[in-house]
Amino acid sequence: MKNPYLSIVIAGRNDNYGGDFNQRLQNTLDWISHWVNHYHLPAELIFVNYNPIAENDSIAEMITFPVATSYFSTRIIEVAEDVHQELLEEGIRKPVPFFEFIAKNAGIRRAKGKFILCTNADVVFDPQIFEFLSKQNLEEGVFYRATRVDFNSKEKLIFAGNEANFLAQVHRNVFKYFMRGGTYLLKSPLSLYTTFRLLNIYNFVRRLFYTAIYPFRKITRIFYIPFSEELFTFQYACNASGDFFLMDKESWLKERGYPEDTWIATHCDSLHLLMTAVSGVRQKNLPWLVYHQEHERRFNFDTENHDMNLMYHHLLANGAVMTSQKCSFNTNTDDWGIFNYDLEETNV
């Protein structure tokens, strides 16, 4: 497709990350293809195949990528192992085999769409999001966010063309909500969106409370009132922002994508959101949810981890300065997104 309205960028590799990456990715691809074609949304999917493992089957052998239609096309962009090796920098990036946000930047730099949506390879969007996008009324100079919820089940859910059944199972198995300024573990007997609306009200009041007592945070700690270190966590939709971040291409290029000099990927999405917001791009939050398929992960928020602590304090320190001084710290060079390399590309 020469002139898609929307480019959807995701990244991954042929390592079956978390033990079931292939099935999660297949769900995501099938879901996107189904709804893009259903709503006649001119879109391209860009899958950045980062540092593939030579001895494993290729990602094209593991996954059935959607066939091209008059409304939808798929491009696979490969970042080969030798390119990955060139990106290893001691003391700058932890030497892991997958640099998530450099991979996404590679897709962003090469996207053809007027608007670019970055998401993850195991996220499915509420159908109303596709309907909204199909109206082609997105604004330039605005970034769009959607709240992520996590779902799991005893048996892995597989989307096999029955969207109503799949979505009903997803709704029944939601157990975690990533709201602005707070994450909530909650299994509710109410419908998902009723629960979400009630939780939004509670979270709004909670944000007002913590914003009000922020000037007195040193005193409140004496009374054991838990407090996030910085006010910006309540002001901006940083929580799980890497699962849905939509913006016009011109703004993506102006902001130079995600920061590429972070030690690990954790909180890189939050840093990027703050960099974008303080640069004057307006924030809009969509009223619909995106559904993340729960899995085992490399960096887990539930366990103590030095690298994650390091990145969290990096976020707090830099976020506080950026939001108070309204200045961005993105140090990406002009060749961000591996733009100085001619990457191999396959059209599906």
Model regions and ranges:
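A conserved acidic beta->alpha catalytic loop
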Residues: 15, 38, 48-64, 80-84, ...
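Conserved catalytic core of nucleotide-sugar-dependent glycosyltransferases
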Residues: 95, 108-109, 126-260
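Short aromatic/hydrophobic "clamp" motif used to bind/position activated sugar donors
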Residues: 116
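Catalytic metal- and UDP-sugar-binding loop of GT-A-like glycosyltransferases, i.e.
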Residues: 119-121
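C-terminal catalytic/acceptor-binding lobe
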Residues: 226-227, 233-242, 249-250, 261-348
